Design a protein with these regions (language model features):
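Exposed aromatic-hydrophobic patches
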Residues: 35-40, 85-93
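Solvent-exposed serine/threonine-rich low-complexity stretches and specific carbohydrate-binding patches
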Residues: 24-28, 73-81
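A short local loop/turn or secondary-structure capping micro-motif enriched for an aromatic residue
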Residues: 58-59, 81-84
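Noncatalytic modules at the cell exterior or secretory-pathway interfaces
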Residues: 43-50, 93-109
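Short, surface-exposed beta-strand/strand-loop-strand elements in extracellular ectodomains
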Residues: 54-76, 112-122
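Bacterial N-terminal signal peptides
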Residues: 2-9
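Short, surface-exposed loop/turn motifs at beta-strand boundaries within globular domains
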Residues: 30-32, 41-45, 55-57
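Transition segment at domain starts
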Residues: 15-38
Length: 123
């Protein structure tokens, strides 16, 4: 039973339809926070999206830094419930290698729990 639950949770984060690949994640602490997700590796993407799980979260700003030093600002300003995803974010210039993704966010509601912010990419 525990193995089935663990496999189900693992699959919900690692397997996505239509070619989406898990890039990385961060856990948002209670209150306002700024986090950096270092990407690295040889993968390149045309699109990314953000998925929030385990608690509600307000994402105010998202900065995407590319391997060549360019920066893309995405002003999301969205409140996400657990399980919600952002819109698909098209990266300029076709397939791009990511260096890092920076988030400015805060947990919302009265719960003092943490929300998980996962970044997914599509080639």
């Amino acid at each position: 039973m525990v193995a089935v639950v663990a496999l189900t949770v693992f699959n919900s984060f690692t397997l996505q339809p239509q070619g989406w690949r898990f890039i990385g994640d961060k856990w948002a602490a209670f209150g306002p926070d700024r986090d950096v997700l270092r990407v690295g590796g040889n993968d390149a993407f045309r699109q990314i999206k953000i998925k929030v799980t385990d608690g509600p979260l307000r994402i105010d700003d998202l900065d995407i830094y590319f391997e060549n030093g360019e920066k893309m600002n995405v002003p999301l300003k969205n409140a996400f419930r657990a399980g919600q995803e952002s819109r698909v974010i098209d990266l300029p210039g076709g397939v791009r290698k990511l260096d890092r993704v920076e988030f400015l966010y805060s947990t919302i509601g009265r719960s003092k729990g943490r929300a998980r912010v996962a970044v997914w990419g599509k080639r």
